[in-house]
Amino acid sequence: MKNAAAAVTALALLAPIRAIHERICVRKLALVLLCGLGTGLAGCMSFQDIPPREYYVLDDLAKAGAPRPAAQAGRVLLVNPASASPFYDTQNLVFSRSPGQRAYYQFAGWTERPGRRLTELLMRRLEARGSFKSVAATTAGIKGDFVLSTRLEEFYHDTGANPGSVRVEVSAELVDYAGRTIVAQRRFAQSVPATGENAQAAVAAFNRAATTLLDEMSAWIEGVVAQPVVR
């Protein structure tokens, strides 16, 4: 009886060891399979050699200027959250090697989704220019005079021709809040050359493109709102 009890105890102690051994074997097998799939590589990269994923901030490079008086300074602009196609509605940095083809950078991304970030930068820009009494999100629960809706149409690094360029397109629509009518619509597009075929060069070009885009959008919004609204 004592021998049987000892055998049962020994088996119970061996069970966790076997489980750990099996997990190690599975991990080794997964690494071997991963190496086997990478036939185009010069060797197999260990998990320790995989570079960390880097995140970049999309920024407005324009220097803040003095607020400028405007006829529409007493009005309130409400801004809807930007919409985007599912492929661009992500923090992944997108590139394209050929027309109609898109892919994600493996080790590079944005700190915020580009559509959301562009909306934030545009609101800051309009606030700084003093174009409106207030610029707020439609979710703020306040009344406004105009509602701005935007959609991110394109936002990618085109690497089809070295060193490539970035493509940014945004469509915008201004609505008269009281009359519930569309006042104006426009599509903005910027293509800026990149200095290299890598994520860092793409981000620098994206910042320049976004800055120019914000220049155009701000001027357009102010110009449209300055016109009398026909109801």
Q: Which ranges hold each PLM region?
A:
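Sec-dependent N-terminal signal peptides
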Residues: 32-37
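Surface-exposed short loop/turn segments
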Residues: 45-66, 70, 124, 129-179, ...
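Sec-exported extracytoplasmic/periplasmic mature domains
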Residues: 123, 127-131, 218-226
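Short secondary-structure boundary motifs at beta->alpha junctions and helix caps
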Residues: 101-111, 178-219
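C-terminal motif of bacterial Sec signal peptides marking the signal peptidase cleavage site
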Residues: 40-43
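Bacterial N-terminal signal peptides that target proteins for export
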Residues: 3-31
